[in-house]
Curated annotation (Swiss-Prot):
Involved in regulating synaptic transmission in presynaptic neurons. In class IV dendritic arborization neurons (nociceptors), involved in regulating activation of their second-order neurons (SONs) and maintaining synaptic contact between nociceptors and their SONs. Pfam families: Yippee-Mis18 (PF03226). The gene is Ypel. GO terms for molecular function: metal ion binding. It comes from Drosophila melanogaster (Fruit fly). Disruption phenotype: Larvae display reduced nociceptive rolling behavior due to impaired activation of second-order neurons (SONs) in the nociceptive pathway and reduced the synaptic contact between nociceptors and their SONs. Coiled coil: none annotated. Zn(2+) binds at residues 18, 21, 74, 77. Belongs to the yippee family. This is Protein yippee-like.
Length: 114
């Protein structure tokens, strides 16, 4: 049986996919930073993602201070991937609002990474 995804990214773009089900998650063009830390190790910050569902928003104290975040999950296999920044309380962290953290442990590179 073939799984279908909500959104497919163009095959001409370098993409990041769910390591468990290979659903597309983000285009390399949407990558903002590789210098983030998730709860399970290194993580990337993306401007936008696809095939991702958000949980409830909650306040958490992260390495850079208090934030309101929502956990994100792969829509296809329900694997926890990281979180979405809903609100940053520190003015220096406002750039993260509306952005997404995906942990490296949960994604793979596909399409054109030769």
């Amino acid at each position: 049986m073939v799984k279908t995804f909500q959104a497919y990214l163009p095959s001409t773009n370098r993409t990041y996919s769910c390591v468990h089900c290979r659903a597309h998650l983000a285009s390399h063009d949407e990558l903002i930073s590789k210098s983030f830390q998730g709860s399970q190790g290194p993580a990337y910050l993306f401007n936008s993602v696809v095939n991702v569902a958000c949980g409830q928003t909650e306040e958490r104290v992260l390495l850079t201070g208090l934030h309101a975040v929502a956990d994100i999950y792969c829509e296809c296999c329900k694997t926890p991937l990281g979180w979405k920044y809903e609100h940053a309380y520190e003015s220096s962290q406002k750039y993260k609002e509306g952005k997404f953290i995906i942990e490296l442990a949960h994604m793979i590179k596909e399409n054109g990474w030769d």
